[in-house]
């Protein structure tokens, strides 16, 4: 469902690609394109993710992902498809409209997918100064923490933690969180989770 929505969106918005800018980007070495594409994607996805926490109706979709009381790599796939589509479009659309090559686009999606699994993993590894450059389990576990106002709405980036630092939302103490999840009830089965955002609050 998410992929279909992205394909339709890309098809209809293709006319917005600006050829001179696209040609300038494609003239760059591939690795430079890849670095720029990662930054563009992560800034876009950062704001989509942040809006998913601050806009009430978006949070109702995103809460499905945050409902895991413990974190492991499978939590990366505990998603509402509409939430996933929204956040991914926020990251992918700017990359597409700038006209990056399909090879760069594919490599970016591959990295983002692998890293999403890794940062949700139930591991207690620390990586020193690298934790400021690339998202790690420690960084993302604090995004899922439920330990009070100090830890709320932090670490929205999925790739580059310094993006959170730039926008004032980075939080990375030396310890790992002890409590995860949300306070609101969430159905245990997938069908219930799909319907939950649309149920009226009592």
What are these regions (language model features)?
Residues 1-9, 14-15, 22, 28-177:
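Membrane-embedded catalytic scaffold of the fatty acid hydroxylase/desaturase
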Residues 178-202:
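A membrane-cytosol interface segment of integral membrane proteins
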């Amino acid at each position: 469902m998410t992929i279909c929505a992205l394909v339709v969106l890309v098809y209809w918005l293709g006319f917005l690609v600006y050829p001179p800018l696209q040609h300038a980007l494609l003239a760059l070495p591939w690795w430079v394109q890849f670095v720029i594409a990662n930054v563009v994607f992560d800034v876009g996805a950062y704001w989509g993710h942040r809006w998913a926490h601050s806009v009430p109706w978006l949070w109702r979709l995103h809460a499905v992902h945050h409902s895991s009381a413990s974190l492991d790599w499978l939590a990366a796939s505990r998603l509402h498809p509409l939430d996933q589509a929204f956040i991914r479009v926020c990251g992918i659309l700017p990359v597409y409209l700038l006209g990056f090559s399909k090879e760069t686009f594919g490599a970016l999606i591959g990295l983002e997918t692998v890293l999403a699994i890794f940062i949700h993993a139930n591991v207690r590894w620390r990586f020193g100064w690298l934790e400021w450059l690339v998202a790690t389990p420690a960084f993302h576990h604090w995004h899922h923490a439920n330990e009070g106002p100090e830890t709320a709405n932090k670490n929205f980036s999925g790739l580059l933690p310094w993006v959170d630092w730039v926008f004032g939302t980075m939080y990375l103490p030396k310890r790992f969180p002890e409590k995860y999840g949300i306070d609101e009830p969430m159905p245990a089965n997938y069908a219930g989770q799909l319907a939950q955002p649309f149920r009226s609050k009592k």
